[in-house]
From Swiss-Prot:
Subcellular location: Cell membrane
Mode of membrane association: Multi-pass membrane protein
Species whose genome carries this gene: Pyrococcus abyssi (strain GE5 / Orsay)
Entry protein name: Probable cobalamin biosynthesis protein CobD
Keyword Membrane among UniProt keywords: yes
Keyword NAD: no
Sequence intervals crossing the membrane: 4-24, 49-69, 144-164, 269-289
Pfam families: CobD_Cbib
Record-level Gene Ontology MF annotations: ABC-type vitamin B12 transporter activity; threonine-phosphate decarboxylase activity
Function: Converts cobyric acid to cobinamide by the addition of aminopropanol on the F carboxylic group.
Family classification: Belongs to the CobD/CbiB family.
Keywords recorded for this protein, A-Z: Cell membrane, Cobalamin biosynthesis, Membrane, Transmembrane, Transmembrane helix
GO terms, biological process: cobalamin biosynthetic process
GO cellular component, one term: plasma membrane
C-alpha cells in the first residue's frame, strides 16, 4: 500500500467525518478491554506492577496484530481497513471541536465542557484556571493525538501508529500516581514517557515560527515531564500564564476566553505545518527507497 495515499485518505476522513462511532472505534475497544483487565488484575506492590506490564503487553500486542491484518487482504479491503485503523490513531478534528466547546461565558457550562477533556477536579477551578486547563489540554493533546501517532507512522508505518495509540490510551487510563494506580499504572506510564520523549520536543520545534520566546519557556518546563514541553510552548506563543496548581506554572497574563480561540488558531497553523513536513519527508523517503 502507498503510505501517502493511505495518510491522505485518513486525513480526509478525519477532517470531513471526525471520529468513527464508539461501537467500532479500535481505541475505545482498547480502553474497554484494558478496563476489564484492570478490574480483575489490579494489585498493589510488585504484583501490581507486573500485572500492569502484562495488561500493557496484551493491549499492545492486540494493536500490533490488528495493524497487520490489512497486509493480508486484497484491494480495496486492504486500503479500507488500513485507512480506518490509521484514522483511529489520531484525532485532529475531534480535538479541535472538544476544546472549541469550552469557549462560553457561562462558567458552569465551561466547567462541564472542560471536565470532558481534563482529569483534574474542575469544581475547584476559577474562570482563569478553567481557561488555562482548556488551553493546556489542546497543547498537550496536539502531541498525543496528532504529532506522536503520525511520527510513529512515519517511522514504522501503521503498526507504529497503532502501538503508540494503545500505549497512550493505557497511560491516560492508568498513569496516575495515586493509591489505585501507583503500581499498576507505572509500566504503561513509563513506556508512554519513552515513546513521547522525541515527539514532545518535536512539537515544541513546530512552535518556533511564532518566535524564539518558545525556547525560553521550554527551559522552564520540567525535564522529565513530556507534557510540560508543548504546554510551555503554547504559553509562550499566547503570552498567557498556564498553570496546573502544584505541578507547573508558565508566566504571562491571565488567560481569557479569547485566548482559547487564539490557541485554536495556533493549533490549526501548527497542524498544517506538521502535515506539510510529514508529506514532504514521506515523498523524499519514497524517492530514496522506491
Amino acid at each position: 500500500m502507498n503510505p501517502l495515499i493511505l495518510l491522505g485518505l485518513a486525513l480526509i476522513w478525519d477532517l470531513l467525518l471526525g471520529e468513527p462511532p464508539a461501537k467500532i472505534h479500535p481505541v475505545v475497544w482498547f480502553g474497554k478491554i484494558a478496563g476489564f483487565l484492570d478490574n480483575r488484575w489490579r494489585r498493589r506492590g510488585k504484583i501490581g506492577f507486573l500485572a500492569g506490564a502484562f495488561v500493557t503487553f496484551i493491549i499492545v500486542a492486540l494493536a500490533f496484530f490488528l495493524s497487520l491484518i490489512p497486509s493480508y487482504l486484497t484491494f480495496p479491503l486492504d486500503y479500507l481497513l488500513a485507512i480506518y485503523l490509521l484514522k483511529s490513531s489520531f484525532a485532529i478534528r475531534s480535538l479541535y471541536e472538544h476544546v472549541a466547546r469550552t469557549v462560553t461565558e457561562d462558567i458552569e457550562e465551561k466547567r462541564k465542557t472542560v471536565s470532558m477533556i481534563v482529569s483534574r477536579d474542575v469544581k475547584v477551578l476559577d474562570l482563569a484556571h478553567l481557561n488555562s486547563a482548556a488551553i493546556e489540554s489542546l497543547a498537550e493533546n496536539l502531541n498525543d493525538s496528532v504529532v506522536a501517532p503520525l511520527f510513529y507512522f512515519m517511522l514504522f508505518g501503521l503498526p507504529g501508529a497503532m502501538v503508540y495509540r494503545a500505549v497512550n490510551t493505557l497511560d491516560a487510563m492508568f498513569g496516575y500516581r495515586d493509591e489505585r494506580y501507583e503500581y499498576f499504572g507505572k509500566f504503561p506510564a513509563r513506556l508512554d514517557d519513552i515513546l513521547n520523549f522525541i515527539p514532545a520536543r518535536l512539537t515544541v520545534l513546530l512552535y518556533l515560527p511564532f518566535g524564539v520566546k518558545v525556547l525560553k519557556y521550554y527551559k522552564l518546563a520540567r525535564f522529565k515531564i513530556n507534557s510540560d514541553k508543548p504546554i510551555a510552548a503554547m504559553s509562550a506563543v499566547l503570552g498567557v500564564w498556564l498553570e496546573k496548581p502544584g505541578a507547573y506554572r508558565f508566566p504571562g497574563r491571565e488567560p481569557r476566553d479569547e485566548d482559547i480561540k487564539r490557541a485554536l488558531d495556533v493549533y490549526k497553523l501548527v497542524v498544517a505545518e506538521y502535515l506539510s513536513i510529514v508529506f514532504v519527508l514521506k515523498v523524499v523517503q519514497l524517492c530514496l527507497n522506491p
